[in-house]
Amino acid sequence: MYQNHKSEILLATPLIKDDIVFTKSVVYLCQNDRHGAMGLIINKPLADTLKDVFEELHISHTNTFKEILEYPLYMGGPISPHKIMILHTTNGRNYTSTIKLDEGLAITASIDILEDIANNILPEYFLPVVGYSCWTANQLTDEIKSNDWIVTNKLNKKILFNHENKVKWQNHLEHAGYTLQSLDTLFNRNTGNC
């Protein structure tokens, strides 16, 4: 039976292993309906930074704060790996290509938000991602039933946008009420050092 998980967090369980994309992934679900789901992995930083994006798109960044230039891009998923999107809190500004989500969040795929960021006009929280993850109709429901994903609606923006990527998966698990020990018990296996 279909259940809408839009604006919820997917946490990969230890059953997803040896998958370079989804092992220990934290996914924010931007869209979920009877036709499928679309989400962004938010804990897999890449070597590329916003400075690289600004240079590639010829966006002036001479006055951009250093910490913004060094901000990593995140691998949002395997689909359209060259498409950049910004997951961000709404800041009252209107961009050309913004989809408003729940909890005061939005996703924008137009250059105008990148120009604002380069000019230090920043949303309270933001995360630049390239690519996205998507599931066909019933695929996500089947994966959840197979215990590949833990779903939590306990959204915490500080954890969501935190840069402590090595512990973001564990932090989201704990915020959802799980511990590594409870996962070991739940899945009757040793998860090792998570």
UniProtKB/Swiss-Prot annotation:
- InterPro entries reported for this sequence: AlgH-like
Bilayer-spanning residue ranges: none
The record ties this protein, via SUPFAM superfamilies, to: VC0467-like
Q: Which residues form the signal peptide?
A: none
A Pfam entry, by short name: DUF179
Q: Which GO terms describe its cellular component?
A: cytosol
Q: Which domain of life is it from?
A: Bacteria
Similarity comment: Belongs to the UPF0301 (AlgH) family.
Quote the protein name from its UniProt record.
UPF0301 protein FTA_1286
